[in-house]
């Protein structure tokens, strides 16, 4: 058993080794606690603040993006309404322009028709006057041949022409 006890002592350190190891461990722990731990804590706090700030910025950016999207949607809706209104106004104005053009065209057509009608009536009057004059000359010549003499008096010619025209008008009616 002596050998077993000596083998166990090989694995267990001596008490002074344990004591000085504990003293060094406490010194190193105090050194870490006083110098390194505050620096690490400051770095960790700074990093946590950055992360929290980044999260807050991201949330604010998301909120701003949502507001911008809502504003954009409202503007888009307003633009669509405005475009619809402009399109309807343009259609109404086009209808009004077409109606005005149609009215002017009808008025112009009526004016042209009236002018043409007056021109036709004027030409008809001129043709009738010209025809009466030629018929009168022909009638006088014919009457002169029939009567065997020439009708020389203007009054007689005029009376005869008027009678023939009156007869033609009465036959016409």
From Swiss-Prot:
Gene3D superfamilies: F1F0 ATP synthase subunit B, membrane domain. It is found in: Cell membrane. One of its GO terms (molecular function) is proton-transporting ATP synthase activity, rotational mechanism. The keyword Disulfide bond does not apply. Keywords: ATP synthesis, Cell membrane, CF(0), Hydrogen ion transport, Ion transport, Membrane, Transmembrane, Transmembrane helix, Transport. The chain crosses the membrane at residues 18-38. Disulfide bonds: none annotated. Its main location: membrane. InterPro entries: ATP_synth_B-like_membr_sf (IPR028987), ATP_synth_b/b'su_bac/chlpt (IPR002146), ATP_synth_F0_bsu_bac (IPR005864), ATP_synthase_B_chain (IPR050059). The keyword Ion transport applies. It is a single-pass membrane protein. GO terms for cellular component: plasma membrane; proton-transporting ATP synthase complex. Pfam families: ATP-synt_B. F-type ATPases have 2 components, F(1) - the catalytic core - and F(0) - the membrane proton channel. F(1) has five subunits: alpha(3), beta(3), gamma(1), delta(1), epsilon(1). F(0) has three main subunits: a(1), b(2) and c(10-14). The alpha and beta chains form an alternating ring which encloses part of the gamma chain. F(1) is attached to F(0) by a central stalk formed by the gamma and epsilon chains, while a peripheral stalk is formed by the delta and b chains. F(1)F(0) ATP synthase produces ATP from ADP in the presence of a proton or sodium gradient. F-type ATPases consist of two structural domains, F(1) containing the extramembraneous catalytic core and F(0) containing the membrane proton channel, linked together by a central stalk and a peripheral stalk. During catalysis, ATP synthesis in the catalytic domain of F(1) is coupled via a rotary mechanism of the central stalk subunits to proton translocation. Belongs to the ATPase B chain family. PANTHER family: ATP SYNTHASE SUBUNIT B, ATP SYNTHASE SUBUNIT B', CHLOROPLASTIC. This is ATP synthase subunit b. It comes from Bifidobacterium adolescentis (strain ATCC 15703 / DSM 20083 / NCTC 11814 / E194a).
């Amino acid at each position: 058993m002596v050998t077993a006890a000596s083998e166990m002592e090989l694995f267990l350190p001596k008490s002074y080794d344990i004591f000085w190891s504990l003293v060094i461990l406490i010194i190193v722990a105090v050194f870490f606690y006083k110098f390194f731990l505050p620096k690490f804590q400051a770095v960790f706090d700074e990093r946590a603040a950055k992360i929290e700030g980044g999260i807050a910025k991201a949330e604010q950016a998301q909120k701003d993006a949502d507001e911008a999207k809502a504003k954009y949607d409202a503007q888009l809706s307003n633009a669509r309404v405005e475009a619809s209104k402009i399109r309807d106004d343009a259609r109404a104005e086009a209808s009004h322009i077409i109606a005005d053009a149609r009215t002017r065209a009808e008025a112009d057509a009526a004016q042209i028709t009236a002018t043409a009608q007056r021109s036709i009536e004027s030409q008809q009057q001129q043709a009738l006057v010209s025809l009466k004059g030629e018929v009168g000359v022909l009638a006088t010549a014919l009457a002169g041949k029939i009567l065997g003499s020439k009708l020389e008096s203007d009054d007689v010619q005029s009376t005869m022409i008027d009678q023939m025209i009156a007869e033609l008008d009465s036959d016409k009616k």
